[in-house]
Amino acid sequence: MLEPITSEHIVSENNSLTTQSVNAEQPAVAKINLLDLNRQQLREFFAKMGEKPFRADQVMKWMYHYCCDDFEQMTDINKVLRNKLQSVAEIRAPEVAEEQRSADGTIKWAIKVGDQQVETVYIPDGDRATLCVSSQVGCALECKFCSTAQQGFNRNLRVSEIIGQVWRAAKIIGALKVTGERPITNVVMMGMGEPLLNLNNVVPAMEIMLDDFGFGLSKRRVTLSTSGVVPALDKLGDMIDVALAISLHAPNDKIRDDIVPINRKYNIETFLAAVRRYLAKSNANQGRVTVEYVMLDHINDSTDDAHQLAEVLKDTPCKINLIPWNPFPGAPYGRSSNSRVDRFSKVLMEYGFTTIVRKTRGDDIDAACGQLAGEVIDRTKRTLKKKMAGEPISVRAV
């Protein structure tokens, strides 16, 4: 059964994004992590210290353009303020627990978040460098083809743990002001977790990605992927404008109810209506959404499925990414053959859809789509139920 979506998963009506105190008078043992603050919050923090707003901009440039986490190195800030910052604040990104490098250049990092881990994937491709970022430890949505979903939901990541993945990757690859080149050109919120179930932290993190004093990415180069949390998608459109990708994976409700269980709450028609509402507000998407469709052998990959998919998407401007399924231990599916993928793709193109078969990257290090699992201390009710029922538990360490 799909775990209920609670207030722990999603922003409430009365909860603002500025949920963390920015009181600079805290004792040293409770230093505020500046990676938790977007630019507006950082300016409020400096105002409480009696400083001008431009000080926030200066510090932010050091943090994100230089990947600097040492106030003493911020040479255009006076010594008195640097000392004050040392006493009340810190710049602390999550650390790398383990690094794996693929033969194709993909890098997967296991990132320490408290006593647990999430995974972040760096995918270089010519002049593009895409970072796949996690938003939660585990996931509540139980998509059957996804390794992360087998863990269940553990907790939401903080802003500093989300933007910290980008910061840490940029630090490793080489900061903009150090190398003269952007270490990361694109960010996709397609790692572990459902981003729309962590809006309070995902949105401020994306604001930092877009901010000129942050990572300065174009809104067309920051992509949020969702499986269809409709109320949160409607909220997203009022909060920020970024590129949208949807994890559809089925041509009809019967199949999607089984493999993407949130469909039982928000069916395809309801989901696509919300997508069109978002597109109507968005400039980042240039009028169309990216549809993600994982190819599962003899589950959703027939030519009849392709015709149904074309029909269901006829009123939703989109491009379609067909994703070869990437196996993980204990999974009940097989990968569609190349011939079935090719036939499926040709049907969609005959209907006029831009259709791309995604190139699998990093599968030799379990960094491909659907393979991210991380190493977690699993406290979920789902795992407890499995233990009590004597069922096998599939949580793969990195």
UniProtKB/Swiss-Prot annotation:
Family listed: Belongs to the radical SAM superfamily. RlmN family.
Domain of life from the UniProt record: Bacteria
Q: Does the keyword Glycosyltransferase apply?
A: no
Instruction: Look at the named UniProt entry and state the broad enzyme category this protein falls under.
Output: transferase
Q: Protein name, please? A: Dual-specificity RNA methyltransferase RlmN
Principal localisation: cytoplasm
Q: Which residues form the active site?
A: E119 (proton acceptor), C369 (s-methylcysteine intermediate)
Q: Which reaction does it catalyse?
A: adenosine(2503) in 23S rRNA + 2 reduced [2Fe-2S]-[ferredoxin] + 2 S-adenosyl-L-methionine = 2-methyladenosine(2503) in 23S rRNA + 5'-deoxyadenosine + L-methionine + 2 oxidized [2Fe-2S]-[ferredoxin] + S-adenosyl-L-homocysteine; adenosine(37) in tRNA + 2 reduced [2Fe-2S]-[ferredoxin] + 2 S-adenosyl-L-methionine = 2-methyladenosine(37) in tRNA + 5'-deoxyadenosine + L-methionine + 2 oxidized [2Fe-2S]-[ferredoxin] + S-adenosyl-L-homocysteine
Q: Which cofactor does it need?
A: [4Fe-4S] cluster
Where is the organism placed in the taxonomic lineage, from the top? Bacteria, Pseudomonadati, Pseudomonadota, Gammaproteobacteria, Enterobacterales
The protein's UniProt keywords, in alphabetical order, are: 4Fe-4S, Cytoplasm, Disulfide bond, Iron, Iron-sulfur, Metal-binding, Methyltransferase, rRNA processing, S-adenosyl-L-methionine, Transferase, tRNA processing
Organism annotation: Serratia proteamaculans (strain 568)
Q: Does the keyword Metal-binding apply?
A: yes
Q: Give all residue intervals belonging to the Radical SAM core domain.
A: 125-364
Q: How is the cofactor bound?
A: Binds 1 [4Fe-4S] cluster. The cluster is coordinated with 3 cysteines and an exchangeable S-adenosyl-L-methionine.
Role this protein plays: Specifically methylates position 2 of adenine 2503 in 23S rRNA and position 2 of adenine 37 in tRNAs. m2A2503 modification seems to play a crucial role in the proofreading step occurring at the peptidyl transferase center and thus would serve to optimize ribosomal fidelity.
